[in-house]
């Protein structure tokens, strides 16, 4: 993943990607997938929820159907994405790095990342951070894309994105000390036979 292997290049990519994000994101991820992520996070009206790599707020909207917006905290590395999200929702949007989350240990009941891990330079570190800030017994849920079936799309996508296998996601969760690990593979959707893996684990 040469384009995003360091923070500076990653930030530059995100800044330009934000211009087309709202057009590209729905092509990769359906509402059904986002709802499944939120369902697996076991959120209720009293939950304090963190979304990592929240983008412009697509998954945040699904979270807000279950818990008040003031109980949702969202972190994204791109100021342009945060600005758009703030126009959509009244959740707590914070500019920050998935691999160095600006929160104390054991802060949140549930921690979610949907459609962001594929752009992280170090996904294992990001999942460790998600586990760190989640309360004992809380859920960590990550949605990750599968490699595109079309060879032309795949060749382009592999230059800017990571496509972790289900086994790789489970290994990252184990490394982060998570237990009760589960996963769901979803598809077909648009151009893909199997599009995503949604992995969850309990702290």
Residue ranges of model-derived segments:
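A short glycine-rich, Lys/Arg-flanked "PGG" loop and its adjoining helix->strand segment in the class I
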Residues: 124-136
